[in-house]
């Protein structure tokens, strides 16, 4: 008798995606992050839903409603900190997932890669708007600084900023609309993630060797379900360690002070996962130039398939390309550090050098290294 999972239309869909899916036999732990991102998204939606039950998106009560959640709601503190630190875990998994795609040449699956870039942008937008909601000092001033970047758009910049704000400054209207978008975007992300999977399953997963997986495939269940569950336990271990021992480690202390439009904090900075882009933004003296560099730092990912000059898909057997890849990783860590530092010497210079090197590595060094390797292997 045919199992129900193979006959029922709904279960058949799940079966083809998670159970009987033919998967390459040699994919490593780096292929775990897709499922971990799915787990993070589910966690964020569930905790966010419970937070939304007690939160009030109003400038006069938002801050105290967050304090109320933390102090008075049953297990409100753990829901809040799971949501805040869950976002950090989300971005750690996201960066590692993108890094894996870059290293093993998964970007050659164009549709999957491009939807992934849209997912990254949507997640960044969601996280930014979520950071504004507690209505602390850094929430308010972070929102003011980042939304003000729109004023760099020629001719319509000022009107655009006021349109986004819903007034002449970041105020109640801004908070209300940010809450609305913060609530709806995760569901859009879920739909995009389903599309991401749909296109991935059209081609099948890549593998560390960068060669065809067709001759040697195994069922996703039980092999990779067990492997993914191990990854999930490790993720939960990290998350719960953070939530239960040091929940404010990645936050900003000034966000425990209620938003005050008359008092600017000495150093305005976003959450840690935006610091690399923030450093690139600050390293360009011109406002419009900085905004363009900020946008390009993310959108450059869309150019990577066109910049792929190597004859091999994966970097596994390409030492020169590996060198440029790890240079890029170290450079991003330096940018993240610089983004959190005050705007003074020597941080300005380090930021400018690191920003220039970021674009040079992707646009020049990586394609050049691949061409040299082609020559060395006589694959001209």
UniProtKB/Swiss-Prot annotation:
Cofactor binding notes: Binds 2 heme b groups non-covalently.
Necessary cofactors: heme b
Keyword Iron: yes
Cited PROSITE patterns: CYTB_CTER, CYTB_NTER
Residue ranges crossing the lipid bilayer per the database entry: 33-53, 77-98, 113-133, 178-198, 226-246, 288-308, 320-340, 347-367
Keyword Heme: yes
InterPro entries the UniProt entry points to: Cyt_b/b6_C, Cyt_b/b6_C_sf, Cyt_b/b6_N, Cytb/b6-like_sf, Cytochrome_b, Cytochrome_b_C_euk/bac, Cytochrome_b_N_euk/bac, Di-haem_cyt_TM
Residues reported to bind a ubiquinone: 201
Residues reported in the UniProt entry to bind heme b b566: 97, 196
Primary localization: mitochondrion
Family: Belongs to the cytochrome b family.
Function: Component of the ubiquinol-cytochrome c reductase complex (complex III or cytochrome b-c1 complex) that is part of the mitochondrial respiratory chain. The b-c1 complex mediates electron transfer from ubiquinol to cytochrome c. Contributes to the generation of a proton gradient across the mitochondrial membrane that is then used for ATP synthesis.
Note: Heme 1 (or BL or b562) is low-potential and absorbs at about 562 nm, and heme 2 (or BH or b566) is high-potential and absorbs at about 566 nm.
Protein name: Cytochrome b
Organism: Hylobates lar (Lar gibbon)
